[in-house]
């Protein structure tokens, strides 16, 4: 872990931008307690890796047990020992099959295990989250149940920003031969490339789009889908594994920014049922347009390599999400006939920097402040929430003052229409108890949210009323 940490620090794009690495660990891994303290300020500094972003993969079983009784025991194992003794990798399974194999490991006396109370594990997770903002959350069973390409593999984890959820597999050396070529001795390796996931991202600026106009939205979404598909051909690939995977799956990540902006200009409050209903329709419309556009591209250029047998081809994708209207049924038939150009379509990235350039709000988060000063190259630049006026001022409620259950419920509604995941931040104050933070995690799991990004904490003690300050 130290080596990974130092690599992230060393690879800094010629001093312009420090590298960043997210490390995902299963919640049943034997080293979990130490892993959860990688970035905390207390403890042995030799065991720290402050420049790594830790993330934890959770099965449904863990959250069910945490909800039912925190005093239950949870058992941690060494994955290598499981492979040696049992002959399988526990991480290669999910859902009911994973639970059966996990309980088989629990009951096998040949395996050494580290047992802890779920309460103790949850306490470590939440303390780290409140203190450092991490670990990120990856709900493994939720992700893999919704995977439209489960026929080709499994999704083990997400990326640095928790919005990517695509099949992945390891790069394997099949054989190594020592040969002689032109009098020289050479080593020839035969390598199986695996699935090396690549991000091809773009975002719709919701605050600047006519979201109610179905025709215009279809046109704009289709344009972005085509552009992202072209990026796959035009891109520079520093390693061949990335190129191979990108051309096999042709995965893209169409996202969204300006979410709070779009609500504010329509006078829709974040903490309202109107918000949930409106964005449910918006993201269903975006999803429909993206699928239709990808299918048209498949008709024009051909389907992605693994389309046959996918949920797109069988129609299971539409059935799982309850898309039963005549329009959706017609699209399902069209997709089954024409194919899909892209294996994965939607992923909501954080867009914290690009949203400022676009003059809108970041990702799907509420604004942190209505106005603030941003430091850029030694200068302080004033920034204000987009379209800030007497009509939108009170609509722009600070993220730290917003009831986070509304943000999570909204994420759950959006998730139905997003085949990958979302960069969902939780905003808490020092007044939150650990139990309240745990309840947010449980609510996210219950709402079908696949991932949780940062837990951003802030004290309210020195806050001044913005409308009264002068």
For each feature predicted by the language model, list its residue ranges.
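A structural-propensity feature for long, helix-poor, extended segments
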Residues: 1-21, 193-198, 211-236, 291-295, ...
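Core structural elements
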Residues: 27, 31, 225-234, 245-267
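Catalytic alpha/beta core of large soluble enzyme barrels
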Residues: 162-166, 228, 232-233, 317, ...
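A glycine-rich phosphate-binding loop feature that marks nucleotide/adenosyl-phosphate handling sites
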Residues: 23-31, 56-57, 79-87, 139-151, ...
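Active-site cavity-forming subdomains of large catalytic enzyme subunits
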Residues: 1-203, 210-211, 237, 241, ...
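Active-site-adjacent structural elements in folded domains
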Residues: 184-189, 238-249, 262-266, 330-331, ...
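Internal maturation/activation junctions in enzymes
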Residues: 16, 220-243, 269-351, 440
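Glycine- and acidic
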Residues: 17-22, 43-44, 104-111, 186, ...
């Amino acid at each position: 872990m130290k080596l990974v940490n130092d690599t992230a620090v060393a690879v800094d794009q010629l001093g312009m931008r420090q590298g960043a690495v997210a490390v995902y660990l299963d919640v049943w891994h034997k080293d979990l307690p130490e892993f959860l303290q990688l970035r905390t300020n207390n403890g042995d500094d030799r065991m720290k890796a402050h420049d790594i972003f830790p993330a934890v993969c959770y099965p449904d079983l863990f959250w069910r047990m945490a909800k039912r009784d925190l005093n239950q025991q949870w058992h941690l194992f060494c994955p290598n020992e499981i492979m040696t003794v049992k002959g399988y990798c526990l991480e290669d399974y999910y859902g009911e099959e994973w639970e059966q194999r996990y309980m088989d490991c629990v009951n096998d006396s040949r395996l050494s295990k580290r047992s802890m109370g779920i309460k103790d594990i949850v306490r470590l997770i939440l303390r780290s989250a409140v203190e450092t903002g991490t670990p990120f959350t990856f709900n493994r069973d939720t992700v893999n149940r919704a995977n439209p390409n489960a026929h080709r593999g499994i999704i083990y984890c997400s990326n640095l920003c928790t919005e990517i959820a695509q099949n992945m597999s390891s790069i394997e050396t099949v054989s190594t031969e020592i040969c002689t070529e032109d009098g020289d001795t050479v080593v020839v390796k035969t390598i199986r490339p695996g699935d090396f996931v690549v991000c091809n991202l773009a975002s719709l600026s919701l605050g600047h789009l006519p979201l109610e106009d179905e025709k215009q939205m279809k046109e704009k979404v289709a344009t972005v889908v085509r552009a992202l598909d072209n990026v796959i051909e035009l891109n520079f690939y520093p390693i061949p594994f990335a190129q191979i995977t990108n051309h096999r799956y042709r995965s893209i990540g169409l996202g969204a920014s300006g979410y709070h902006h779009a609500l504010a200009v329509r006078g829709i409050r974040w903490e309202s049922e109107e918000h949930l209903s409106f964005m449910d329709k918006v993201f269903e419309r975006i999803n429909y347009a993206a699928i239709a556009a990808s299918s048209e591209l498949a008709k024009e250029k051909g389907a992605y390599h693994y389309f046959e047998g996918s949920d797109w081809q069988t129609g299971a994708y539409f059935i799982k999400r309850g898309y039963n209207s005549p329009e959706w049924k017609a699209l399902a038939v069209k997709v089954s006939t024409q194919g899909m150009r892209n294996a994965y379509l939607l992923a909501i990235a954080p867009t914290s920097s690009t949203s400022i350039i676009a003059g809108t709000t970041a990702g799907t988060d509420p604004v942190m402040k209505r106005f603030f000063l941003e430091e850029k190259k030694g200068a302080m630049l004033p920034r204000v929430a987009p379209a800030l006026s007497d009509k939108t001022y009170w609509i722009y409620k600070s993220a730290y003052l917003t009831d986070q259950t509304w943000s999570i419920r909204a994420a759950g509604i959006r998730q139905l229409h997003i085949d990958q995941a979302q960069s969902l931040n939780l905003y808490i104050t020092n007044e939150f108890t650990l139990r309240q933070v745990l309840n947010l995690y449980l609510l996210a799991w219950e709402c079908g949210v696949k991932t949780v990004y940062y837990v951003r904490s802030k004290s309210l003690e020195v806050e001044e009323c913005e409308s009264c300050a002068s």
